[in-house]
UniProtKB/Swiss-Prot annotation:
Pfam families: GFO_IDH_MocA, GFO_IDH_MocA_C3
Organism whose genome encodes this protein: Pseudomonas putida
Name this polypeptide is given: Putative 4,5-dihydroxyphthalate dehydrogenase
Molecular functions per Gene Ontology: nucleotide binding; oxidoreductase activity
Role noted for this protein: Transforms 4,5-dihydro-4,5-dihydroxyphthalate to 4,5-dihydroxyphthalate.
GO biological process: phthalate catabolic process
Length: 410
């Protein structure tokens, strides 16, 4: 069942918890998708609250408690810092609001379990996203796998090289113990995608993480192998130190589905060189997000030309290879090579609204529910532990590890 943008008459009244970077990335979706109406928000920054009230003629509160109590709100989009996700979900559920919470779902499996229980007890839906496993190229690739034409998935290769760690960050974003670093922020995407494509439960993880910039004391890179119950395995690699850009291998289409100028190389590092202290860096980040002095509102004509993505991926099946791109899926059969074009997106990240809308108005259980996101977090935690202990980690058997919390720079 799919409620299209044109066919839908009822609108989902959404409140936003946190008007920072995540909201900035979702805002083009909220503006373009007629199934959604932004009816409220909360943020500790007065400038962001004022801009929201101007832009949407809707109240902006200082606390989530006030927003959650607003009877005009159907669901809450929780885009607050990672360490607040569990508590903010509890407050939303206590007020009978459906929940769309950003990845990672939380920072521990206990927090995930409480979030799932809180929403179940309140009778509200819990969806975790946006995550790149929502992206249409991966969903279409999964459909091709499901057709049976290519046989079983045997191996998945996924990599992404970005400037993630060179972008302006708040102090907690550079602390693994507080949910910062590439594993919590970026592996949550990559693990989700390979889980979707493998179509099976992961059973074992072996990983190594990289932390080689003393000025950015958290993981900036990782590589891991995942094994699945169905016999498939996946290799995932990420590097956020801002040198090679793997969008070069995606036809110079950036993560957000827009053309990327290769001549802009090094822009994040140049911007970061403007600051000398952690406070200055945090201010620089705030200035570029919603309500900030450098924030640029999305233009109605600034449409993505392709779907969003998370770097090059190749799925090797028994009878062929599949390579999801930003605008197509490359299909490699035994005697032919084809490019299956995808219809250009009209609304970025509309796949997230699909799940939220169907959950709200039709009671459909979402794919990216709490249990799904908990399993992704379990793998991320296992990656940290595997790297620390230099061994394989079996999933489902006490993967939580506290050592990285005590010494996040190790």
């Amino acid at each position: 069942m799919m409620a299209s943008h044109a066919e839908s008459t009822a609108r989902l009244r959404l409140g936003v918890v946190g008007l920072g970077r995540a909201f900035t990335l979702m805002l083009p979706t909220f503006l373009a998708d007629r199934r959604v109406q932004l009816v409220g928000a909360c943020d500790p920054r007065e400038q962001a609250r004022r801009q929201f009230e101007r832009d949407f003629d809707a109240p902006a509160y200082e606390t989530i408690e006030d927003l959650a109590a607003d009877s005009n709100v159907d669901a809450l989009y929780i885009a607050s810092p990672h360490q607040f996700h569990a508590e903010h979900t509890r407050i939303a559920a206590a007020n009978r609001k459906h929940v769309l919470v950003e990845k990672p779902m939380a920072l521990s499996l206990d927090e995930c379990d409480r979030m799932i229980a809180d929403c179940a007890e309140a009778g509200v839906k819990l969806i975790v996203g946006h995550c790149h496993s929502f992206d249409t190229p991966y969903l279409r690739t999964r459909e091709l796998i499901g057709s049976g034409e290519f046989g079983a998935v045997k191996m998945i290769q996924a990599l992404n090289y970005t400037d993630y760690l060179q972008r302006p960050r708040r102090p907690e974003e550079l602390s693994t113990a507080e949910g910062g670093g590439a594993v919590f922020s970026q592996a949550a995407h990559q693990v989700d995608v390979v889980r979707l494509l493998a179509g099976s439960r992961a059973t074992r993880v072996r990983a190594a993480v990289g932390n080689w910039d003393p000025a950015r004391p958290t993981e900036g890179a990782y590589t891991a192998t995942l094994w699945f119950e169905n016999g498939a395995f996946a290799s995932i690699t990420y590097n956020g130190y801002g040198h090679f850009d793997s969008d070069e291998w995606m036809d110079w289409v950036g993560e957000m589905g827009k053309p990327k100028n290769p001549e802009a190389y090094g822009g994040a590092r140049r911007l970061l060189q403007q600051v000398q202290t952690a406070d200055e860096e945090a201010r620089l980040k705030a200035e570029g997000t919603y309500g900030g002095t450098r924030y640029v509102s999305p233009s109605p004509t600034d449409d993505a030309t392709a779907f969003q993505h998370f770097g090059p991926i190749i799925v090797s099946c028994e009878g062929g290879d599949l390579r999801p791109m930003a605008d197509a899926v490359m299909i490699y059969r035994p005697h032919s090579r084809d490019r299956m074009m995808l219809e250009r997106p009209t609304v970025p990240r509309s796949e997230v609204i699909d799940e939220l809308y169907l959950a709200q108005f039709y009671g459909v259980t979402p794919l990216h529910d709490g249990e799904w996101a908990r399993d992704t977090l379990e793998i991320c935690l296992a990656m940290l532990r595997s790297s620390e202990e230099q061994r394989d980690i079996t999933l489902g058997v006490n993967v939580e590890d506290t050592q990285w919390r005590e010494n996040p720079s190790s």
